[in-house]
Regions:
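Nucleotide/pyrophosphate-binding catalytic subdomain
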Residues: 1-263, 283-284
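Short, basic/aromatic-enriched C-terminal tail that caps enzymatic domains
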Residues: 267-284
Length: 284
């Protein structure tokens, strides 16, 4: 390297180390979904970034969905996927597809990209995600809400310097398998593990003042401001439960939560190393 290249690299490394310091030997939970999961090139970059963080001493837990794959599997059965208020209606055929696609194909494809450092798990394993049937005005079928997270298997994996890769199905007291929202699962797992940071990868730039204009990105939100943003209609629709997961995590003791744009290459590293990506939620 030329002298100026060495100096530039050293400066970059120094800055990265400073940003990373609060998270070394700490747990970061990444909720993985959206375009970064569908685009094969982005998927490889995400897994490379997670491997790098693991090598730098950050304990990463990857929680993933698999909506497009599940919908594809349902269509192969001759059915149309059904959603109410953004939640998938999960009948017996659909929960079978969830088990095949989410805990099988999707989970193992991610583990394979982690080159021996990933360990594939689902919420049924070790009774990790204990749930009960979601109570709502409509019947969503086999959809659950988490009542307890058992971290035993996660603790074992993290202590062995492995990267848990978790598909979001759970089980109730009767042994009935339920589909669980991935954002909710990631938040609950992060709280149970005492994670320092929660990262949610999405297909949008972050929280926008005008949802049709990415130039109106709100880069930071203090959690006490969230209700007013809801009142103003800035936080609306599907962003309300997603941001609620972030605020629940922070109010439970997490340092910060990010909703980041998964369409951006190396989005996780950018958010960790002080770059501008998505919206950061924090508490004063």
């Amino acid at each position: 390297m030329l002298q100026n290249e060495v100096e530039n690299f050293a400066n970059l490394l120094e800055k990265a180390t400073a940003y990373l310091a609060p998270f070394q030997e700490k747990i970061i939970v990444v909720k993985y979904g959206g375009n970064a999961m569908i685009n094969e090139d982005l998927k490889k970059l995400v897994m490379q970034d997670i491997l790098l963080l693991n090598q730098l001493g950050v304990k990463v837990v990857l929680v993933h969905g698999g909506g497009p794959e599940i919908s594809q599997g349902v269509k192969l059965l001759g059915k149309e996927p059904q959603f109410i208020n953004g939640l998938r209606v999960t009948d017996q055929d659909t929960i079978n597809v969830v088990l095949q696609m989410l805990t099988g194909k999707v989970n193992k494809s991610l583990v394979a990209l982690l080159k021996g450092k990933g360990v594939g798990l689902c919420g049924i394993d070790g009774n990790m995600l204990q749930c009960e049937k979601l109570q709502a005005e409509v019947d969503y079928g086999f959809v659950g809400e988490i009542v307890k997270v058992n971290t035993q298997l996660l603790d074992l994996a993290l202590n062995a310097n492995l990267i848990p890769v978790i598909s979001t199905v759970g089980v109730d007291e009767q042994g009935v398998v339920c589909n669980i929202n991935a954002d909710t699962a990631a938040s609950e797992i992060a709280m149970a593990l005492g994670a320092a940071k929660l990262v949610s990868m999405t297909d949008i730039a972050g929280l926008l003042r005008d949802r049709f204009d990415e130039n109106t990105l709100i880069p930071e939100v203090e959690v006490s401001e969230v209700q007013e943003l809801i009142n103003q209609g800035i936080i609306a629709g599907g962003m309300i439960p997603k941001i609620a997961c972030c605020t629940d995590f922070i109010n439970a003791g997490g340092i910060e939560a990010n909703i980041i744009d998964g369409r951006v290459p190396h989005a996780i590293l950018v958010s960790l190393f002080g770059g501008k990506n998505g919206t950061l939620f924090y508490k004063k």
